[in-house]
From Swiss-Prot:
Residues 1-48 are annotated as: Transactivation. HIV-1 lineages are divided in three main groups, M (for Major), O (for Outlier), and N (for New, or Non-M, Non-O). The vast majority of strains found worldwide belong to the group M. Group O seems to be endemic to and largely confined to Cameroon and neighboring countries in West Central Africa, where these viruses represent a small minority of HIV-1 strains. The group N is represented by a limited number of isolates from Cameroonian persons. The group M is further subdivided in 9 clades or subtypes (A to D, F to H, J and K). GO terms for molecular function: actinin binding; cyclin binding; metal ion binding; protein domain specific binding; protein serine/threonine phosphatase inhibitor activity; RNA-binding transcription regulator activity; trans-activation response element binding. The modification Asymmetric dimethylarginine is found at residue 52. Zn(2+) 2 binds at residues 25, 27, 30. The gene is tat. Interacts with host CCNT1. Associates with the P-TEFb complex composed at least of Tat, P-TEFb (CDK9 and CCNT1), TAR RNA, RNA Pol II. Recruits the HATs CREBBP, TAF1/TFIID, EP300, PCAF and GCN5L2. Interacts with host KAT5/Tip60; this interaction targets the latter to degradation. Interacts with the host deacetylase SIRT1. Interacts with host capping enzyme RNGTT; this interaction stimulates RNGTT. Binds to host KDR, and to the host integrins ITGAV/ITGB3 and ITGA5/ITGB1. Interacts with host KPNB1/importin beta-1 without previous binding to KPNA1/importin alpha-1. Interacts with EIF2AK2. Transcriptional activator that increases RNA Pol II processivity, thereby increasing the level of full-length viral transcripts. Recognizes a hairpin structure at the 5'-LTR of the nascent viral mRNAs referred to as the transactivation responsive RNA element (TAR) and recruits the cyclin T1-CDK9 complex (P-TEFb complex) that will in turn hyperphosphorylate the RNA polymerase II to allow efficient elongation. The CDK9 component of P-TEFb and other Tat-activated kinases hyperphosphorylate the C-terminus of RNA Pol II that becomes stabilized and much more processive. Extracellular circulating Tat can be endocytosed by surrounding uninfected cells via the binding to several surface receptors such as CD26, CXCR4, heparan sulfate proteoglycans (HSPG) or LDLR. Neurons are rarely infected, but they internalize Tat via their LDLR. Through its interaction with nuclear HATs, Tat is potentially able to control the acetylation-dependent cellular gene expression. Modulates the expression of many cellular genes involved in cell survival, proliferation or in coding for cytokines or cytokine receptors. Tat plays a role in T-cell and neurons apoptosis. This is Protein Tat. Residues 85-101 have a biased composition (Basic and acidic residues). Its main location: host cell. The keyword Transmembrane helix does not apply. Keywords: Acetylation, Activator, AIDS, Apoptosis, Host cytoplasm, Host nucleus, Host-virus interaction, Inhibition of host innate immune response by virus, Inhibition of host interferon signaling pathway by virus, Interferon antiviral system evasion, Isopeptide bond, Metal-binding, Methylation, Modulation of host chromatin by virus, Modulation of host PP1 activity by virus, Phosphoprotein, RNA-binding, Secreted, Transcription, Transcription regulation, Ubl conjugation, Viral immunoevasion, Zinc. Residues 1-24 are annotated as: Interaction with human CREBBP.
Amino acid sequence: MEPVDPNLEPWKHPGSQPTTACSNCYCKVCCWHCQLCFLKKGLGISYGKKKRKPRRGPPQGSKDHQTLIPKQPLPQSQRVSAGQEESKKKVESKAKTDRFA
């Protein structure tokens, strides 16, 4: 590498200027597009997948966040529907009649 004169401004250092001239749409010095192309070409808009944020852990103060919920027994239905009893009787009666056939 060539030694750089410390008295030179940074934009005058060798290699700091673009090799090609700036176009009327895109400036290589400032890397900005004109407003028309920015809106027309949709520059700066990406429809790609967004990165998910990592899940946060439990709060620092509590050891287990589920200890606050009191445990209750699950409700059990004691009643048996009449439709089930009738269907059982029909199956039993069919089984008895088929046995003799």
